[in-house]
A protein has these predicted regions:
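Actinobacteria-biased recognition of intrinsically disordered, low-complexity terminal regions
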Residues: 1-10, 413-416
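Exported/periplasmic cell-wall-interacting domains
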Residues: 175, 298, 314-416
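Acidic, low-complexity Ser/Thr/Gly/Pro-rich repeat segments typical of extracellular/periplasmic
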Residues: 2-5, 13-260, 287
Length: 416
């Protein structure tokens, strides 16, 4: 028992000594090098505290690529075509907002976003002679916004161009009536203007334009319009460049009604006229046409809108002076229906010519009829109806001396 006690006592002292030695190293580590004695077991890093694990830095966000903005028209542009769209195009970002407005009134112009928000395009027409501001805000991939403001002005009023169409909208005319367009300014870009005017026949009939000058163009088909149909005329001329800086200032759609087919066949040799309605003979009358010094024009003439129940004809209007052969001073007539600008009419013959109807040609180129015949024409024939004259040695009227278009072969009419 005593030996065992003696054996245990030294071991207890050894443990105390060892613990004391370790304590000294740890304390010393607080003020010196933090190294462990070589006789201590190595630490297991996999069991270390969370604070001793290496931290992982988050992946840095790359900087946003700067947005590039292209605006049309460019800032400060003058004489912008009001029919052209205003565009904002963003690259490396989107168009967050766009406001296009009249700088004087604040009136805004609508627009739409396209290409996933990268492009804004105006959707409404602009006004002539107006200053506009265009404020565009873009956003980059990080959501950072930037605003760009520009101004521009549109074409001044002095460069507006328009036209007048004959016949007027909703008018009813005969089957031979060409459509005529008279422009306020010379048209240089004729193909562009033709493309902007769409003419549709209810029967599908197709015609062609024929330019008589830079300000006048007409349109007709190869044959007369079908009776009792309609034409639709779409004039989409707003913003169309006529040339010389002139810009079309309107768009409009008009309808023209086509009535019965009414054709007068005038025969100078037979000294008579026959009138057909829808290819059926309606009336025939004795007539007097142009004499040998003033023969009637041959070919086709279209009735104009000029009708006079009572009219005074003056010889001076056809170039005759007092003392000239054929000078008649002035005469009063009834039921005058104009066929040409140069003075060809269908009218009631003068009292002195009445006995010669159907017998002798006495006129200065007009078609003289009885009171009954001239009255019937006055009441029953309308603008766009046609007169076809044969049996006379004279040439046809000029195409623009009234409507002499039908004297031109269609192949020639349709060519430039």
């Amino acid at each position: 028992m005593s030996e065992l006690d003696q054996t245990k006592k030294p071991r207890r002292g050894w443990k105390i000594a060892m613990i004391s030695a370790v304590a000294l190293v740890i304390v010393a580590g607080g003020v010196g090098a933090a190294t462990a004695p070589s006789w201590l077991p190595s630490a297991d890093s996999s069991k270390g505290s969370a604070s001793s694990a290496p931290s992982v830095a988050p992946t840095p966000t790359p900087p946003a690529i700067p947005v590039t903005l292209a605006v049309t028209p460019e800032a400060g542009t003058a004489s912008v075509n009001p029919g052209a769209p205003v565009v904002a195009q963003a690259q490396n970002g989107t168009v967050f907002s766009a406001v296009l407005k009249d700088t004087a009134t604040g009136e805004t112009v609508d627009g739409e976003l396209f290409v996933s928000g990268q492009k804004w395009i105006s959707q409404g027409p602009l006004k002539f002679n107006t200053s506009y501001s265009f404020e565009v805000t873009t956003a980059d991939s990080a959501g950072t916004k930037a605003t760009h403001v520009s101004t521009f002005t549109t074409v001044p009023a002095a460069h507006e161009a328009n036209l007048v169409m004959y016949p007027a909208a909703n008018a009813t005319v005969g089957v031979a009536q060409p459509l005529e367009f008279n422009f306020s300014e010379p048209v240089i870009n004729k193909e562009a203007v033709e493309s902007a005017i769409k003419i549709t026949s209810a029967t599908g009939q197709v015609g062609a334009f024929h330019w008589y000058s830079d300000t006048r163009v007409r349109y007709r088909a190869a044959e007369f319009w079908p009776a009792n149909t309609a034409l639709t005329v779409e004039m989409n001329l707003f913003g169309v460049d006529f040339g010389n800086g002139m810009i079309g200032n309107f768009s409009k759609t008009s309808n023209v009604n086509i009535g019965n087919k009414v054709v007068m066949e005038a025969d100078a040799a037979a000294k008579s006229v026959s009138i057909f309605v829808n290819d059926q003979l309606a009336r025939s009358f004795p007539a007097t046409l142009g004499d040998t010094a003033f023969p009637s024009a041959s070919g086709y003439m279209v009735l104009t809108s000029d009708k006079q129940r009572y009219a005074t004809f003056k010889a001076s209007s056809i170039g005759l002076k007092p003392g000239d052969p054929g000078d008649y001073g002035s005469v009063d007539v009834e039921f005058a229906t104009r066929l040409s600008n140069s003075g060809i009419f269908i009218h009631q013959a003068t009292p002195s010519a009445m006995p010669y109807l159907g017998v002798v040609n006495l006129s200065h180129g007009c078609i003289g009829l009885s009171a009954e015949g001239a009255g019937w024409v006055f009441a029953n024939m309308h603008p766009g109806d046609i007169v076809h004259t044969v049996g006379t040695p004279n040439a046809t009227i000029a195409p623009t001396d009234g409507f002499g278009d039908w004297n031109i072969p269609f192949e020639q009419y349709a060519s430039r």
